[in-house]
């Protein structure tokens, strides 16, 4: 599951850097961090991982990805303001 998380994080970071306005950035946030976003969908799948070590690793990757995306959003928001 970690490659999927990395892919979703990369897509979100790319979309954030391409956002030209604050409104565009808000759409990116909803698309990637919202309830129906890519990262949220992957997070729901964490419980289905049977191996505790794999689940722990995927959870850590999910946390790191979400943190990176949130930090990038804040940085981009400051740039656009």
Describe each PLM feature range.
Residues 1-81:
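N-terminal alpha-helical targeting/anchoring segments
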